[in-house]
């Protein structure tokens, strides 16, 4: 687990330091196709991305809607939805951090807020640029707007690259911290099992620890009593039989109590097993899904992100 944790951190740092270089439009499209939108915030961001791709076509329909406020209003709604889901995901993760130091919580919160702010700034810049284009377009009614469309298209390509980079940076950070939480939870369950194991073993040996010494002491006492009674001239046969029966009754009661203790301990262990095994299995399944998702996300983002061409 520790080795995988270290590998995820190294991957996160390497992805954050990647440079952005030009490249063909089709490559960026393929990269976005590998986006693992399993979380609500990832799905919301996917809707923002798809709408932005449609706007970038600058078709006649897009041009008509850009002259009104419809495009910017739609982007605003998609952006607000995305940031709302991002904040909810961050809050949930911070709650799951559990018994870590306040310093660690503060550092994680600061890093996630910074990544979240970068993503929000990217979407805000897209919206602002389209609002600016709308004003320029309205001022050029009846004139050629080809140059204006070219500048907007180039700017949107640049913003799509930045948006993809910052989105995957946030995704990797969330994955790394979530992996640490699952590792800690699984380790805690294993520790609890290690502590409960000896309890079951002790309960299983209660019968031997209690009944055997009692039996030995009872037999020794009976022998001493027989010797004393014989020396005193008393008949000991019936009396010893009575004593033996009493000893057997005491022994049976002790054995019954020991068995009850053992059964209670076994039942307690069974309840704990039924409580924690589904949790461990669920965490192991989520861990496997997380590792696969991180590997796909990291493998889909090369050290240099190509630019786009219409």
Curated annotation (Swiss-Prot):
Which molecular-function annotations from GO does this UniProt entry contain?
cholesterol transfer activity; heparin binding; phosphatidylcholine-sterol O-acyltransferase activator activity; phospholipid binding
Q: Where are the transmembrane segments?
A: none
| Region forming the signal peptide | 1-18
The record ties this protein, via Gene3D superfamilies, to: Apolipoprotein
Region ranges (8 X 22 AA approximate tandem repeats): 77-248
Q: Which Pfam families match?
A: Apolipoprotein (PF01442)
**Record region (Homooligomerization):** 259-310
> Which compartments is it annotated to reside in?
Secreted; Secreted, Extracellular space; Secreted, Extracellular space, Extracellular matrix; Extracellular vesicle
> Binding of heparin: at which residues?
159-162, 222-229
Listed GO biological process terms: acylglycerol homeostasis; cholesterol efflux; cholesterol metabolic process; lipoprotein metabolic process; melanosome organization; phospholipid efflux
What stretches of residues are sequence repeats? 77-98, 99-120, 121-142, 143-164, 165-186, 187-208, 209-226, 227-248
What role is this protein assigned? APOE is an apolipoprotein, a protein associating with lipid particles, that mainly functions in lipoprotein-mediated lipid transport between organs via the plasma and interstitial fluids. APOE is a core component of plasma lipoproteins and is involved in their production, conversion and clearance. Apolipoproteins are amphipathic molecules that interact both with lipids of the lipoprotein particle core and the aqueous environment of the plasma.
- PANTHER family referenced in this protein's UniProt entry, alphabetically: APOLIPOPROTEIN, APOLIPOPROTEIN E
Its assembly, as annotated, is: Homotetramer. May interact with ABCA1; functionally associated with ABCA1 in the biogenesis of HDLs. May interact with APP/A4 amyloid-beta peptide; the interaction is extremely stable in vitro but its physiological significance is unclear. May interact with MAPT. May interact with MAP2. In the cerebrospinal fluid, interacts with secreted SORL1. Interacts with PMEL; this allows the loading of PMEL luminal fragment on ILVs to induce fibril nucleation.
Q: What is this protein called?
A: Apolipoprotein E
**Encoding gene per record:** APOE
């Amino acid at each position: 687990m520790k080795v995988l944790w270290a590998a995820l951190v190294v991957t996160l740092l390497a992805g954050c330091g990647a440079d952005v270089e030009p490249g063909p439009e089709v490559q960026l499209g393929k990269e976005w196709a590998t986006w693992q939108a399993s979380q609500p915030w990832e799905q919301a961001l996917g809707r923002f991305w798809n709408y932005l791709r449609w706007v970038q076509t600058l078709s006649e329909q897009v041009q008509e809607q850009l002259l009104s406020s419809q495009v910017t209003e739609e982007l605003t709604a998609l952006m607000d939805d995305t940031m709302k889901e991002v904040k909810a995901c961050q809050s949930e993760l911070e709650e799951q951090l559990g018994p870590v130091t306040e310093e660690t919580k503060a550092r994680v919160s600061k890093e996630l807020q910074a990544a979240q702010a970068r993503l929000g700034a990217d979407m805000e810049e897209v919206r602002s640029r389209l609002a600016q284009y709308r004003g320029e377009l309205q001022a050029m009614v009846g004139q050629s707007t080809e140059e204006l469309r070219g500048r907007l298209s180039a700017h949107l390509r640049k913003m799509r690259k930045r948006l993809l980079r910052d989105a995957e940076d946030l995704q990797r950070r969330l994955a790394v911290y979530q992996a640490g939480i699952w590792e800690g939870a699984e380790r805690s369950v294993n520790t609890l099992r290690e502590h409960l194991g000896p309890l079951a073993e002790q309960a299983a040996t209660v019968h031997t620890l209690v009944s055997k010494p009692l039996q030995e002491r009872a037999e020794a006492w009976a022998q001493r009593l027989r010797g004393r009674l014989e020396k005193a001239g008393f008949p000991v046969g019936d009396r010893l039989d009575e004593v033996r029966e009493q000893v057997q009754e005491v022994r049976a009661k002790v054995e019954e109590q020991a068995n009850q203790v053992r059964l209670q301990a076994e039942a307690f262990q069974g309840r704990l097993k039924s409580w924690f095994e589904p949790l461990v299995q669920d965490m192991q399944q989520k861990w496997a899904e997380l590792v696969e998702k991180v590997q796909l996300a990291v493998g889909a983002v090369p050290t240099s992100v190509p630019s786009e061409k219409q």
